[in-house]
């Protein structure tokens, strides 16, 4: 399933990172990350947070720089850099159980 407000943004970020890491490991150029949803949903208790998110201006996406020649299995957080990353203040929303 796809929790549009909380889950999908995390999935996009993590799988986009994985796309870059796999391309690097295989010696390939990074292609595109395509995400499809099954059972996409928005929880009613997220509506205020969603309206806040939609009222904000977008920023240009940052660039990912992988600062190592290590294998995908040895890379850690310190080997990664986001260039020109900008963000708005966090929006809190409850996780559905």
Swiss-Prot record:
Keywords: Cytoplasm, Methyltransferase, Nucleotide biosynthesis, Transferase. One of its GO terms (biological process) is methylation. The keyword Cytoplasm applies. It catalyses: dUMP + (6R)-5,10-methylene-5,6,7,8-tetrahydrofolate = 7,8-dihydrofolate + dTMP. Its EC number is 2.1.1.45. It is found in: Cytoplasm. (6R)-5,10-methylene-5,6,7,8-tetrahydrofolate binds at residues 3, 96. DUMP binds at residues 1-3, 11, 41-43. Pathway: Pyrimidine metabolism; dTTP biosynthesis. Coiled coil: none annotated. GO terms for cellular component: cytosol. One of its GO terms (molecular function) is thymidylate synthase activity. Homodimer. Catalyzes the reductive methylation of 2'-deoxyuridine-5'-monophosphate (dUMP) to 2'-deoxythymidine-5'-monophosphate (dTMP) while utilizing 5,10-methylenetetrahydrofolate (mTHF) as the methyl donor and reductant in the reaction, yielding dihydrofolate (DHF) as a by-product. This enzymatic reaction provides an intracellular de novo source of dTMP, an essential precursor for DNA biosynthesis. Belongs to the thymidylate synthase family. Bacterial-type ThyA subfamily. PANTHER family: THYMIDYLATE SYNTHASE (PTHR11548:SF9), THYMIDYLATE SYNTHASE 1 (PTHR11548). This is Thymidylate synthase. It comes from Staphylococcus epidermidis. The lineage of its organism: Bacteria, Bacillati, Bacillota, Bacilli, Bacillales.
């Amino acid at each position: 399933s796809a929790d549009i407000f909380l889950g999908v943004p995390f999935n996009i970020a993590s799988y986009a990172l994985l796309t870059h890491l796999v391309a690097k490991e295989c010696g390939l150029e990074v292609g595109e990350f395509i995400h499809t949803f099954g059972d996409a949903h928005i929880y009613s208790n997220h509506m205020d947070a969603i309206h806040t998110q939609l009222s904000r201006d977008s920023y240009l996406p940052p660039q990912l720089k992988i600062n190592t020649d290590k294998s995908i299995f040895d890379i850690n957080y310190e080997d990664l850099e986001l260039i020109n990353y900008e963000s708005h203040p966090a929006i809190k929303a409850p996780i559905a159980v």
